[in-house]
């Protein structure tokens, strides 16, 4: 009572553990002691339907949460507090599982068709959940501007659409341009972006692919690329966040917005707590000259997938077409462009000199090479931001 509605995915996360346990135990008649023994057997591997070496405490916690929900709702002999609950300690993510630039490129090369490469790059460069990717419609994506919005009609996105502004496609832009050449029907904007692979059989673009299809695609890519690290959709989500924080130092709220978490979410302090420690040590060693700084960007390709121009290691955007590869570059570019628009609003149209200054800056930023140089120079970007702020204050 008073808890409000729950997403279908959340309900399923409770139902599945209950269904599993109900195969061996009558949950209506079970005692608290019996349930504790069952949970212990899961951990040691003695319980049916689990692997021989057992399951981790973090997984057993899902069963504990489901049981507590069940017994809180039903008035049986077992109370919710009779079920122990393992505490969440540390990050569930192993930093060693994060993909290197070379492994990202291996995975991309292993995707042997345009549809599968589009799926992979959407997961890699947006950090979105599988459900969000498979339900994107053509009208949710602006290829020209390299942005997308989540489909607001979809249930099960865990509130991600509550902050549903434009998000960057980054390196997925060129891949999607290529995929749309093969898409079965781009005339209807209501059609789904990702469809079944075009073949001799008819493809219905008005129906989304199954979540299992996305999992299978990443599994096949992992196998063909010979990558030992996790490559399932949720692992790629963790990969995106880790890179955004570790390599590009994006603010927590920016990262949470990009992946669809609420502003007050604690995900950065829990799931991604592994981003402290070793990463801070590495930066300190670089500052003192003990360690050579990394000059490559994990999300920067060797060749731009929009215009096929060779890209310098560590470049944030293509010097020829202006395609943005890294999340920090997109944020910086968006800040400058927003500042220019605000300057137009705040400036008196009769103030010819100021209008000419703003137009000159806007024209310069249309040059991809100039924009790329600006994005690589943090001091210049800071000065531009300060100038924009001063101009808005003065007006």
Predicted regions and their residues:
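Basic, Lys/Arg- and aromatic-enriched nucleic-acid-binding interface segment
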Residues: 101-131
